[in-house]
Structure formats: C-alpha cells, structure tokens
C-alpha cells in the first residue's frame, strides 16, 4: 500500500509528487545557490529548470504484487500533462546540479547532487512551479526561499558544513594524537568536543559564508562540478536534436540512477542510440527555435519544457522503452555469448583460429546489415507498451543460421570434408602408372638395407664445389648453368644462406632427374657412379658443434641406424603371448625400448659418422608422397603420464584414419588393422637447459622443420613448387652458422627399467612426435599444398575425436598440433631413429618408436618390425603395393577451402564489406614496377630505404649507423608480398646487422637477418615494413617479426630520397 500523510484534523492526504529538477542560472549557479541557502536574496538569481523527473512514492502495486509494465506506464502517464507540467496537488522538488555523491559499491553512482529541497503545497506556489515546468518560466528566488524545506535541505549539507568548520574555523592543525576514536587537534581537545560546539544548519553555513566566502565557494564548486558547464556544453553533450536533448538527458541524469537496472550502467552514447529508435510521432514545433539558437539557459529551458517529448505519453513511455530495448539487445546478443561459451570448451582449434572465430562471430552478429535489420525490428512508434510496434529481432537467429550452423559442421569430420574439401585426382593405369612411380618415387635400392653406404655426403662448403664441378660436366649436355654468386651478392658476415639454398635446390633437382635411355642420370656426375638409379633421397645433416652437411644416398646400411632400438622378434612374440591386449602390449614394448637406453655416438664426428647421428629428409615437391609424415609439436601445461599419452595416441590414430578414409575414398582402409607408426623424441632432462637466452636459438622440443625466406640463386624458382616460406609455424632453414641450427635441450633418460604403471614421459613443456601413415593403395599424393591440406584435415579429424581431447585436453596449451611448414620444397624433417644436435655439440632427443598396435593387428611382430623399415618413414619412398600396379590415383589437389572455415569466412566478409583488395602486382604497377623483374623491384626498394632509415634514426638511434650503407637484394617474391634482404656494404665496420628488438651478448649481437617487405595495406595502399629474423632464444625462436611499417605514399612520391629523409606522414 502507498504511504499517506494526515492533516491536523486527521484526514488522509496523498503523498506529494516527487520531482527531481536539474536547474541552472544565468550567472554563477553556486554563488546563487549559496545565497538562497543563507537567505541572502540580493545575490540570488532566478532558476531555470531545464530537465526534471517525476514519480510518486506511493505508487500502488498491481493485483498480483509488482505492477506490470502497462500499469507502470499508466501510472507515469497520469503524472505528465499533455499541455506541459505535472498533475498533482502538492510537490516535493529536489533541486540538483551535476555532481557525484560517494555511495555504496554495489549501487550505481548518482550523476547529480541535490542542493536544496522545496515543498510546493499552496495553490499559488503550485501554479508558479507548473509555469516553470510547462513553459520554462524562471523560478524567482522569493518562491524558492518561501517553499524551502530547511530540515531536509540542511540534512544534505551537514557533512560539508562540518568539514568546512573544522578546516576553516579550527585551522585543522597537524594531528598529534593517535587514538582513532578521539584524535587530538589541540592539547586536551578531541574532535568530538570540536564537533559538539559547531553551529550546523542555515546558521552555521551563513556564518561560514559571511566570514570565509572564497573558501566556501571553492569547496562547493569542487563538490558541484556542474557549475562550470555552459549552455553550449549541455547542448553538445546531450543534443543536438530535440529528442535526445530532452529524453536522453532526462533519462541519463535523473531517471536511470533512480530506476537502477541495466540502464543505469549504460553510458550516454548508448542511451542516445536507444533514443534514436524511439520513433514517436512528433508534430512540428510552433516556434522557430533550433539548436543553433540555444545560446542561454533561458533558451534551453524554454525549448526543453515546451517540447512534446517532455510531456504526455512520450515522456512517460521512454524509460520503459529503454528497458525493453536493452532486454531485446541482450536477448539477441546473448545467443552469441552462449554459443561462444559452448564452443570454447568443444571447438578444438589453435589459439589463433579461436581468436579469429570470436572476431568473426561478433562480425556476423553485428555487421552493418544485420544491425540495421535489428534496429528496424526494435524501433517503436507508440509509447504505450500495449500498443508497441516492436517486432522480434532476427539478429540471434540469423547469426546462428549463417555462422554457427556452419561452425557446427566443423565439429563433424564428414560434414567438414563434404563442405570444405573437393579432392582432385588423376587416374593412371598400366605402363603409365608404373612409369610414374619409377619417375616420382625413390629408387627401391635407395631404401633397401645394404652392407654399406653408397652416395655423396659432404659439408656445405665442399658440397658447393662438388656441385659446381658436376654442373660443369653437365652443361655441355643441356644442363642449366648455375650462376655463381657475384661479389655484390655476398650476404656479408660469412652468412652462406643463398649458397645453402642453392645447395638444397640443386641437389633436389639432380636427385629427381630421370635417366634418359642408356645415359646415366645427371646425379651420376656428382656421385661418380654411372650405375646409380634415381630418384634419390637428399638429406641435411647437422654437424657438431656447428655447421651443415648434405647427402644424397643411393644405398645405405639401415640396420646400423635401427638395430639398437628394435626389440627382438622373440621378445615381441613372448610379450604378445603374455599381454595380448593391444594397449598393454604396446606400452610394454615401448618401455623395453626406453629401458634399453639406445646409445648415441659422441659428438665431433666427420660427415660420414655424423650422418648416422642426425639426418633430415629434404622434401622434394617434384616427387610423389607415399607416406603421410606428420610433425607434431605439442605444447604442454603439465607433463602427461605415459599411459595417458599412449591412450591418446590410439585415439589420434583413429581420428587420422577417419580422415584418410574420407580423403582417399577409393582405397580400402580398415581402421582396426591399418598401420600407423609413432615415434617420440626422447624426454628432456628435469634440469634446466644449458643454453641461456642470448645463445643461438633452441627450437621447440621437436621443431625439426626448416624455414628461411628463400633467397636462392638463379634457377631455384622453377623448382620451388608450392613453397610457402612465410609459414611462420615452422623453424628456420639450416645454414652453416650456429645461429641457424635446430637445437634442443634434452638428454636421453637414464636406462633404468620402469614399473608397468610408472610415468615414463617426463616432458614438461613440449612433446615432439613423428607420425607415419602410408598413403593407402592405389593413391599417391603430389604437391606441397596438397600435403598441407591432408595434414590440416587430419588435424581437424583428430581434434574432433572426443576421446583424444578428453585424454590430453587438460594437459595441452594449444591445439595447433601439426606443423604443415615441413611440406615446402627444400624444407627438411628429422627422420625417426635420429637425434638432434645440442648447443654443446652433443646428440639428444632421439626419435624412438612408440608402439600403438592396431586393435585387429594380425601379425604383431611384423607390425613392430615395420617401424624400422625406412620405406615407412620417408616422404617419397617407393610404395609398398605392387611394383607394377594396374592403376594408381594421383591426388594433386584438395581444392575447396579446407584450409579453414574461419579463414574462408573472413576473406568473404572482407570482400563483401570492404571491397576487393588489389594484388601486389596491381599496386606496384602504379609505380611502374614489375614484381617479376628483380632489378626494378630492388631499385624501387632502394628508393624507399630513406624512409626506413629515417624511422631507425628516430626510434633506434644507436643502430642508425649500421643502415647508412645498406643495399637491397631480392629474397622471395609471392603473390601478396615481396621480401628483400638488407645487406651491409662491404666497407661497413660490421658485416651483419644487429637485432633491434633486444640487446644480446657479444656472441649473439649480430645474428639477425633484416628484410624489407612490400605488401598491400588498407585502402589498397603500398606498405613497406622492416622485418627481422633474429636467432637468439629470447627473440622467439627465429620467427620473422615486423618492427614497423611505413606508407610508401602515392605513386608521385617515388622520388623520395634514398638516404636519411624523414618518412612522410601519409
């Protein structure tokens, strides 16, 4: 029930209407207000009430308790007159200025602060108030003082009067006591005694104001900071249109703090946005007032009080509409949050993809067309809730249909492949099939066990000489000549990166060239052996302690590689009889390998010995792939117990084979019997690594792949099929320098047998794995991009396997498991049974088998022995099916958008909403530069060096001297960027450029490669970026980092100076 007052005769009287009024004066509002409070009318000015809120404290409840929305509207509607002003016999008006009162934490802060309270109860006083509220008539000081409620008013000012009295009258000397209840300000006198003698109320404030006017004014101006606002400030803040000036100002300043709820937490711009969809019909104003003419508070007050939005149903309905609008917004966007929260736990993608997914989800939900549709749906043309014209918004439903439904398809591997993969294959039969396999897979003898090694192996420097000699012999027979590196092309500092790239690609070309008739193959000139058969595997060998070597093998003693990590057949048979369950048998056999602790040769061997310690197969994009070899690098939150890891690998196998069945539909793949071979890098020691942060970069636990922005010599490009050197998920390309080595801090664990249930794996940060899946007959795979697609589909299938995720999900940091950079032409991957070379030159982290036996394996000893068969773990091994197949199918493209649904969606959205992005070729064409013409690109980049050097001088002044005489050499040219290496001049003091990101020790100070990258930025403008690849550990493991980017400017600015001019501000 509402509260009631009683008159002196005991009759019931309704409570007055509560009004909160925001007022202003022509002069200083604080001075005028203090004059009113102290009853000094000479200094008071008339008050303008330009915004107000009204409500009844005795509003009745509905029949079922809390009033309904329509009942609330009717109750508020009864207060606002259609002609302006308020209905009611008496009013309690709280006059406010802008200011903040200290409040409780869980309640929103008020946006206004009350100054005084007046009661308008007599008919004459009510008429004056109605004129002020309905017509904007100024309220005279005499009317304010006549209606002032002294008790309620000075209850508002008691604290500030008390504080001023203590601070001014008693001068607040330094505290000399320490008691919290009775702090002493003078000897023998406590704060309580001081307060007890104070004069509060109107008398106390008047005394202070008369004797200390300046200090009282200053205190009140600080408390009521609204005193400094001008008419222009209010107009610019809440205007400029009439609706927001009236409704948004009233709601934001007065109604939202009173009503509370979500609306009290919305900022002013959000309230103005909601106000824009409150499209209540509005008749033209009878006057000619406009926002530009509101230059005084008198004009603003008259404009606002006579507005149709300040009266009647329009005024009563707006607070209720704000609640409905917020509820509709939250309901529609809540669907987005609900789906994201669900997907956070079940959508197993990499961190980067999940971030892309969140951005895409918000873009799909809040793209301009969808927001426009939503705003049209929530717009109302009638203030009454019962007659509201709002419609259900399709925002959440469309987001689910257009985006989340497709995301759900990613959670089913069959739907994923169906929607995103369109395989393209070519069938070959009979002699054509046999000829293709002979020409595109290793010669059988290369991977057949032999008594001794036969081939060529040498250090990179010597291999360059041998290649040059072989090519000299071949050139008269039509072999393309390799242009020697000219002095001007020298990378400086002894860095032999271009030569190393030349070695790799020239070796791969020689190894893949077929024999023509009776003429020996081209590689015979290198091996000095006319009987050699091609194609041949090419290997990279990390030397100890530094350096690289390369090899091409015609035959090898593979038993020497695997004999100490291969369980005897009798032991396998005995274990299979003792523990026939595949999981338990696999763990037992794996423990036997670990317990034996296979020995590794000491470091410092020659190339012939080192190649049996470390060996990396180099991917040859010209050959067919017969084994899907996956490089897994799993970042861990915590160590994984070996039984759990072994169980997870079983689930990995199942998910991978599910993908293989879908990618190779014509093959017969029995998921319960098909072989899948696992190898794990030996565990790290529990002691901290030897290498410090400034040493050469130590890669991940098993990051064996190679990465380098390819700067190969002439003729390399035609062999660089499907290369993606900017795949930063991969490690750096090897080189002779120690800084480019692929290192790992780990040692072989002690050779002590483990108990059956003990934790064998002690890897705490990362687990490195190699997974080998034979491509099922009758298929082979061709091309780097195709292999990347196969690997990504397999990763998606594995991550959709719930059992795999449950087994290791709590241990894994990032679900980007498979490194696809290893499938680029010229990149290498460490072979099973071989070790890494540590920073001290020692061998560590040998890849040893983990036996995951298929559930329906018919011949366990044969399956275990197959792990040691080199034909099972080489990319281009001769296929295990018939040497003369009736038919083979060459999978040469996966087509579609298998790369990522999110990437596809992002590209489509960018095209739809931001227009077509021009290619780099088109943008460079505006500068008369052709990307395929090396000299023009290098010349144009040289002209841009001036801007780069200017930025370095401004932001890296200590390194500016290094860049005074640099030259530019083309490194890599792709469709969307050009990478050029910056090389110090021959006469420079330092022949290498220093790292700009960190200060390193002397040994690692000059181990950075610096590049200038040209790419297309926003609005199809050409951008020039300075990038560095540093090889110290603290610089993020050899990743290429962009340091800064400058705008190349318009084509007319090609004449930018090439030295030290400042970059343009464009």
From Swiss-Prot:
Point to the regions of Acidic residues compositional bias.
715-725
**Region listing for Disordered, in residue ranges:** 694-727
Where in or outside the cell?
A: Host nucleus
Keyword terms of this UniProt record: DNA replication, Host nucleus, Metal-binding, Transferase, Zinc, Zinc-finger
Q: Which InterPro entries match?
A: HSV_PRIM
Q: What's a BP term from Gene Ontology annotated to this protein?
A: DNA replication
Give the primary localization class.
Answer: host cell
Give the family from UniProt.
Belongs to the herpesviridae DNA primase family.
Question: What's this protein's name?
Answer: DNA primase
Organism whose genome encodes this protein: Human herpesvirus 2 (strain HG52) (HHV-2)
């Amino acid at each position: 029930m509402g509260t009631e007052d009683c008159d002196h005769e005991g009759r019931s009287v309704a409570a007055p209407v509560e009004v909160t009024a925001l007022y202003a004066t022509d002069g200083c509002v604080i001075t005028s207000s203090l004059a009113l409070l102290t009853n000094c009318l000479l200094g008071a000015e008339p008050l303008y009430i330009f915004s107000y809120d009204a409500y009844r404290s005795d509003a009745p409840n509905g029949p079922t308790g809390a009033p309904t929305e329509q009942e609330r509207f009717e109750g508020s509607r009864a207060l606002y007159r259609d002609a302006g002003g308020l209905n009611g016999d008496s009013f309690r008006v709280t006059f406010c200025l802008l200011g903040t009162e200290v409040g409780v934490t869980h309640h929103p802060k008020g946006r206004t602060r009350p100054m005084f309270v007046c009661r308008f109860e007599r008919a004459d006083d009510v008429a004056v108030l109605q004129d002020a509220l309905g017509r904007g008539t100024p309220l005279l000081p005499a009317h304010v003082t006549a209606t002032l409620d002294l008790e309620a008013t000075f209850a508002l000012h008691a604290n500030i009067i008390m504080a001023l009295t203590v601070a001014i009258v008693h001068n607040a000397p330094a505290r000399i006591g320490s008691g919290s209840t009775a702090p002493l300000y003078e000897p023998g006198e406590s704060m309580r005694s001081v307060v007890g003698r104070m004069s509060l109320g109107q008398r106390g404030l008047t005394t202070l104001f008369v004797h200390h006017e300046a200090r009282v004014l200053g205190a009140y101006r600080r408390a009521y900071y609204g005193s400094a606002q001008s008419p222009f400030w209010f107009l610019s803040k809440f205007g400029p249109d009439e609706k927001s000036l009236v409704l948004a100002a009233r709601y934001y300043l007065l109604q939202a703090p009173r009503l509370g709820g979500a609306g009290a937490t919305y900022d002013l711009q959000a309230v103005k946005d909601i106000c824009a969809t409150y499209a209540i019909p509005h008749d033209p104003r009878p006057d000619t007032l406009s926002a530009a003419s509101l230059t005084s508070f008198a004009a603003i007050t008259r404009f606002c009080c006579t507005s149709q939005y300040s009266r009647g149903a329009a005024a009563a309905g707006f607070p209720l509409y704000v609640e409905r609008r917020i509820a509709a917004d939250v309901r529609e966007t809540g669907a987005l949050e609900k789906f994201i929260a669900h997907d956070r736990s079940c959508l197993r993608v990499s961190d980067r993809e999940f971030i892309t997914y969140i951005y895409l989800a918000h873009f799909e939900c809040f793209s301009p067309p969808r927001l426009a549709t939503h705003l049209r749906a929530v717009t109302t043309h009638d203030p009454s809730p019962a007659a509201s014209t709002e419609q259900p918004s399709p925002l959440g439903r469309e987001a689910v249909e257009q985006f989340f439904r497709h995301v759900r398809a990613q959670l089913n591997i069959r739907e994923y492949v169906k929607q995103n993969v369109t395989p393209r294959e070519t069938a070959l039969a009979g002699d054509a099939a046999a000829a293709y396999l002979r020409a595109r897979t290793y010669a059988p003898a290369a991977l057949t066990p032999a008594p001794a090694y036969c081939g060529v192996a040498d250090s990179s420097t010597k291999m360059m000489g041998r290649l040059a000699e072989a090519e000299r012999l071949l050139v008269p027979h039509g072999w393309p000549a390799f242009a020697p590196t000219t002095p001007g092309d020298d990378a400086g500092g002894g860095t032999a990166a271009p030569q190393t790239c030349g070695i790799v690609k020239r070796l791969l070309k020689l190894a893949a060239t077929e024999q023509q008739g009776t003429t020996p193959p081209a590689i015979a000139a290198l091996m000095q052996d006319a009987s050699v058969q091609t194609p041949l595997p090419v290997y990279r060998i990390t030397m100890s302690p530094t350096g690289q070597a390369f090899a091409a093998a015609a035959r090898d003693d593979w038993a020497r590689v695997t004999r100490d990590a291969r369980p005897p057949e009798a032991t396998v048979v005995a274990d299979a009889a003792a523990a026939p369950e595949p999981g338990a048998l696999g763990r037992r056999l794996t423990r036997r390998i670990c317990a034996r602790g296979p020995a590794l040769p000491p470091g410092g061997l020659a190339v012939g010995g080192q190649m049996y310690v470390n060996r990396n197969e180099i991917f040859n994009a010209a050959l067919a792939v017969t084994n899907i070899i996956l490089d897994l690098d799993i970042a861990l939150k915590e160590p994984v117990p070996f039984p759990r890891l072994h169980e997870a690998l079983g689930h990995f196998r199942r998910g991978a084979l599910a993908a293989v069945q879908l990618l190779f539909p014509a093959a017969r793949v029995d998921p319960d019997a098909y072989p899948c071979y696992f190898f794990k890098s030996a565990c790290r020691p529990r002691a901290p690594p030897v290498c410090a942060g400034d040493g050469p970069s130590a890669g991940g636990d098993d990051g064996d792949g190679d990465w380098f922005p390819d700067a190969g010599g002439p003729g390399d490009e035609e062999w660089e099929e499907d290369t993606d050197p900017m795949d930063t998920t991969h490690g750096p390309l090897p080189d002779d320098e120690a800084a480019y080595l692929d290192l790992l801090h780990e040692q072989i664990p002690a050779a002590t047998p483990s108990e059956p249930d003990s934790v064998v794996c002690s890897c705490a940060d990362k687990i490195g794995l190699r997974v080998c899946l034979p491509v099922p007959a009758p298929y082979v795979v061709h091309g780097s991009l195709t292999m990347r697609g196969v690997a990504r589909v397999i990763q998606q299938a594995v991550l959709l396997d719930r059992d795999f995720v449950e087994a290791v999900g709590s241990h894994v940091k990032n679900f980007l498991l498979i490194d696809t950079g290893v499938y680029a032409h010229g990149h290498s991957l460490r072979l099973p049974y071989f070790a890494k070379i540590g920073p001290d030159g020692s061998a560590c982290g040998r890849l040893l088998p983990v036996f995951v036996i298929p559930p329906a394996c018919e011949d366990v000893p044969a399956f275990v022995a197959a792990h040691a068969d080199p034909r099972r773990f080489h990319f281009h091994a001769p296929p295990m099916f018939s040497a003369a197949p009736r038919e083979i199918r060459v999978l040469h493209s996966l087509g579609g958008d298998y790369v990522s649904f999110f990437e596809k969606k992002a590209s489509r959205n960018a095209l739809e909403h931001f227009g077509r992005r021009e290619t780099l070729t088109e943008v460079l064409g505006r500068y008369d530069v052709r990307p395929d013409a090396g000299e023009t690109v290098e010349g144009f980049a040289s002209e841009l060096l001036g801007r780069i050097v200017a930025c370095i001088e401004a932001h890296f002044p200590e390194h500016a001297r290094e860049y005074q005489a640099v030259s530019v050499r083309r490194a890599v040219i792709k469709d969307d960027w050009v990478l050029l290496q910056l090389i110090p001049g021959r006469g420079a003091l330092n022949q290498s450029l220093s790292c700009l990101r960190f200060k390193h020790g002397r040994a690692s100070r000059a181990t950075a490669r610096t590049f200038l990258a040209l790419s297309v930025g926003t609005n199809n403008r050409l951008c020039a970026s300075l990038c560095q690849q540093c090889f110290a550990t603290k610089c993020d493991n050899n990743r290429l980092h962009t340091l800064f980017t400058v705008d190349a400017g318009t084509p007319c600015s090609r004449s930018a100076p090439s030295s030290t001019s400042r970059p343009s501000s464009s």
